[in-house]
């Protein structure tokens, strides 16, 4: 029993290694490992029972003992193992598809005046003629006459013509920075102002935000109304009704006890759990932990 590297084995079967005279010797092998197995010399193509053609390729033998695989239409490669990449010619503008049979890949040989992977662009395209992208920018052809520049770090603009003034992050408080003609411009979030959006707007300077006698409290980028008793809402614009909506949690029922007061009637299980927590806290307070303090 012989074994070839890569799992090949058996006389005449598929195996590791390639049909090369410099194939490496393998342990437990009677000679060298070839594509067809282990033998003292390489098998002859389309002879010695070695017919490697796939995809209905036909083995053809020459008088000198060599052979090759004759591939059906749509396949190529040494063993017809690749689909013909030129079967559907992608080359445009009179370009010629050139297949690389061994790799199963193809390239386009473009007609004069055209370029691109598929010969889709004219050499009169601005990317070639005027080289519009400045400061090391890369020109990408979008169509026959349009392009887009990818700029190097530190530059911006349609043609990378401006120094990116936003690179130093000058805009504060979550504002958006844009560069126009080498200058930055900050678009501030609501509640902030200034060239760099560094100044908080004091909304409380403008009267009327809080209704029914509510007090305005300025906050960074916003404000809050502190309502008088009997009123609620963002602007103190709603009458306060203690149980609408109910403030009670865990299934408790709200009962209004006065104009501005209420009480929660809790479910028995909730009361029991609350009592257990209270008893545990009391034991901790009266026990060892309290004595150590």
Curated annotation (Swiss-Prot):
Keywords: Calcium, Disulfide bond, EGF-like domain, Glycoprotein, Neurodegeneration, Notch signaling pathway, Repeat, Secreted. Disulfide bonds join 46-59, 53-69, 71-80, 86-97, 91-108, 110-119, 127-139, 133-149, 151-160, 166-177, 171-186, 188-197, 204-216, 210-225, 227-236, 243-254, 248-264. Expressed in radial glia neural stem cells during cortical development. GO terms for cellular component: extracellular region. The keyword Secreted applies. Glycans are attached at residues 64, 173. Gene3D superfamilies: Laminin. GO terms for molecular function: calcium ion binding. One of its GO terms (biological process) is positive regulation of Notch signaling pathway. Residues 42-81, 82-120, 123-161, 162-198, 200-237, 239-276 form the EGF-like domain. It is found in: Secreted. It is linked to Neuronal intranuclear inclusion disease: An autosomal dominant, slowly progressive, neurodegenerative disease characterized by eosinophilic hyaline intranuclear inclusions in the central and peripheral nervous system, and also in the visceral organs. Clinical manifestations are variable and include pyramidal and extrapyramidal symptoms, cerebellar ataxia, cognitive decline and dementia, peripheral neuropathy, and autonomic dysfunction. Human-specific protein that promotes neural progenitor proliferation and evolutionary expansion of the brain neocortex by regulating the Notch signaling pathway. Able to promote neural progenitor self-renewal, possibly by down-regulating neuronal differentiation genes, thereby delaying the differentiation of neuronal progenitors and leading to an overall final increase in neuronal production. Acts by enhancing the Notch signaling pathway via two different mechanisms that probably work in parallel to reach the same effect. NOTCH2NLA, NOTCH2NLB and NOTCH2NLC paralogs arose between 4 and 3 million years ago, after the separation of hominids from the chimpanzee and during the early stages of the expansion of the human cortex. Belongs to the NOTCH family. This is Notch homolog 2 N-terminal-like protein C. It comes from Homo sapiens (Human). The gene is NOTCH2NLC.
């Amino acid at each position: 029993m012989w074994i070839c590297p890569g799992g090949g084995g058996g006389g005449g079967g598929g195996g590791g290694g390639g049909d090369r005279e410099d194939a490496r010797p393998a342990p437990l092998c009677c000679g060298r490992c070839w594509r067809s197995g282990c033998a003292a010399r390489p098998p002859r193509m389309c002879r010695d029972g070695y017919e490697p053609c796939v995809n209905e390729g036909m083995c053809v033998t020459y008088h000198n003992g060599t052979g090759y695989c004759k591939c059906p239409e749509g396949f190529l490669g040494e063993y017809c193992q690749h689909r013909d990449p030129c079967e559907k010619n992608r080359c445009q503008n009179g370009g010629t598809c050139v297949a690389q049979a061994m790799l199963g890949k193809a390239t386009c040989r473009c007609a004069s005046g055209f370029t691109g992977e598929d010969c889709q662009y004219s050499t009169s395209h601005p990317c070639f003629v005027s080289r519009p992208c400045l400061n090391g920018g890369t020109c990408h052809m979008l169509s026959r006459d349009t392009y887009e520049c990818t700029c190097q770090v530190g530059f911006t603009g349609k043609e990378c013509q401006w120094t990116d003034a936003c690179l130093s992050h000058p805009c504060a408080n979550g504002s958006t920075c844009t560069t126009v003609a080498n200058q930055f411009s900050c678009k501030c979030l609501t509640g902030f102002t200034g060239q760099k959006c560094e100044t908080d707007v004091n909304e409380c300077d403008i009267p009327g935000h809080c209704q029914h006698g509510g007090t305005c409290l300025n906050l960074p980028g916003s404000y809050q109304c502190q309502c008088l008793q009997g009123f609620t809402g963002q602007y103190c614009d709603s009458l306060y009704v203690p149980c609408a909506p109910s403030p009670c949690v865990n299934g408790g029922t709200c009962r209004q006890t006065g104009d501005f007061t209420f009480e929660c009637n809790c479910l028995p299980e909730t009361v029991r759990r609350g009592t257990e927590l209270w008893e545990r806290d009391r034991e901790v307070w009266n026990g060892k932990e309290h004595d150590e303090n």
